Amino acid sequence: MLLAVIALLSLAAGTTTAEIFTNTFLVRMRQPAERHVADRVALRNGFVNLGPVLDSQTEYHFVHRALPHVRSKRSVPHMRRLKVDPLVDTAIQQAGFKRVKRGYKPLSVDNLVPLYEMKNPGNPGNKDPTDPFFKYQWYLKNIGQNGGKPKLDLNVEAAWAQGVTGKNVTTAIMDDGVDYMHPDLKYNYNAKASYDFSSNDPYPYPRYTDDWFNSHGTRCAGEVAAARDNGVCGVGVAYDSKIAGIRMLDQPYMTDLIEANSMGHEPDLIDIYSASWGPTDDGKTVDGPRNATMRAIVRGVNEGRKGLGNIYVWASGDGGEEDDCNCDGYAASMWTISINSAINDGQNAHYDESCSSTLASTFSNGAKDPNTGVATTDLYGKCTTTHSGTSAAAPEAAGVFALALEANPQLTWRDIQHLTVLTSKRNSLFDAKDRFHWTMNGVGLEFNHLFGYGVLDAGAMVALAKKWKTVPPRYHCEAGSMFDTQEVTSDRSILVKIKTDACAGTEYAVNYLEHVQAVISVNATRRGDLELFLTSPMGTRSMILSRRVNDDDHRDGFTKWPFMTTHTWGEYPQGTWLLEVSFNTQTPQHGWLREWTLMLHGTKEPPYTGLSAADPHSKLAIVKKAHEERLSAI
């Protein structure tokens, strides 16, 4: 069934753009071949073998150095030459596409602070870190700095007080490189788990430019694992954890193979992969992982960490209210944890996207005062206080998850998602424009369309992780489909129902939900005016697509696009699901809903049976009670 899910999602298509082709090729052998055999095949055909794809013995990554790095047409002669080789089955020239960093702002020298400026030697009587920039790290300890709301932070001190600091956990920063010689990073750098896929060597050091463009990965790394009490910059969320650098964003175009090999690199050495990038946040792009990348992620969650599953953390996106992160196939994947941001007074940042796939939030900047940015490491051994965007939010979450994995190394990738739902806090997070309010789902869990289930609470997550019991097996139920084309107009929305028993009586039965996907094909005279809502049998209404004012598409629409919601977490899926398709516009528009498949993902058994809930007001206690009441009513 999982293979069917992968096949379905690999067909998903969104925005069509003019294709660009690179000088790299995916080459499939007729039968398994060792690396030296693939090397000979490449050499005799004028190529260089860069290595296997996802450790495969049948798929290899070839490059032709004489071809331009970027071209507008396929190189048919080179593909033909490969295909006639007796050992080669197929050869596919790699298309190039854009991936952008989230939250990067051009820097001036004024943004940067010399390494030892404001150095404050350690005070043995002070429990706080003595690092000079800790005072600026309000997201770690908010005492009201710069107009912030006291105690609106990640509550990391409660985790540190339990003796948990990220030991024996490695987080890979998939980005433009990591300055692993930075004095605040070098002792926590895991060289064995690192690689440069932009240059194909083991040294993922950033390429320096005059505009400091490639500082992004180094900044993200410091948020996770900057050392404590060394008089340098600030401190990482998990300051005793390790970081790996995976340089993969610094080439003219991204390819499926670069992404796949990055996300599948050393899955038993790397625990967490942190990504602060994605498709262009322009409010009109619909894009996501290609085939090999999808396979890499699925392999990671199923086989990584010796079968426990890798954790993929994704920045939700910086397109603001004009974009929707459910149009980003990375952030909206059920195999990733999508993280949004709030600023120091609890409101959303102006660049935050909203969507139903966001699981939780951390912190970034967005206020007028530049000192409310994220303080972290920077290039040339310097420090910054202006790291920004959801780029800054995702590594904070990775750091919190590193703390949880130290507390309980046996946590699976799904355990981390359950812990996120159960321990994140509403706190004082709010929508500055009063569009999205906190809502309770059918089993009593509060969620928000901007913030997911709230801000991560490191202390609470670590405490629950220590006593956690692994959740029951996960099943995938194709709950129903609709293939009758229906027209929707700007003055008449359509409502489509699927009634399901959630695969009851089969091996795929789902009784307690985790993720829900509505896999939809729809076209419109203006795609950006479409809105989609999914209502569960327990009455939870998720906006799975919001209006995108910049999206003028009238041709592509969405083809088998998996719109995902986490808002029904813990609910019972049996009953009638309602899909609403409408236009949000004053201009006459029309469109066609061509198909809809409802995919339910969750457990057959109650997920928290083996856990005790000491606090009757905790999320765990609330959900357990709802599940127990349901069982007693059956």
Q: For each of these PLM feature ranges, what is it?
A:
Residues 580-588:
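Short beta-strand-plus-loop segments that form exposed binding edges in beta-rich domains
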Residues 148, 156-158, 169, 176-181, ...:
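Subtilisin-like peptidase catalytic core
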Residues 317, 447-530, 592-634:
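Secreted peptidase-domain scaffold signal
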Residues 83-170, 183-188, 195, 200-201, ...:
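Protease zymogen maturation seam
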Residues 2-55, 80-122:
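Autoinhibitory N-terminal propeptides
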Residues 265, 270-274, 309-310, 329, ...:
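C-terminal subdomain of the subtilisin-like protease fold in secreted/lumenal serine endopeptidases
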Residues 175, 328-406, 410, 449:
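Extracellular S/T/G-rich loop segment that most often corresponds to the catalytic His/Ser-adjacent loop
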Residues 25-26, 61, 90-92, 170-174, ...:
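Structural recognition of the beta-strand scaffold that forms the well-ordered cores
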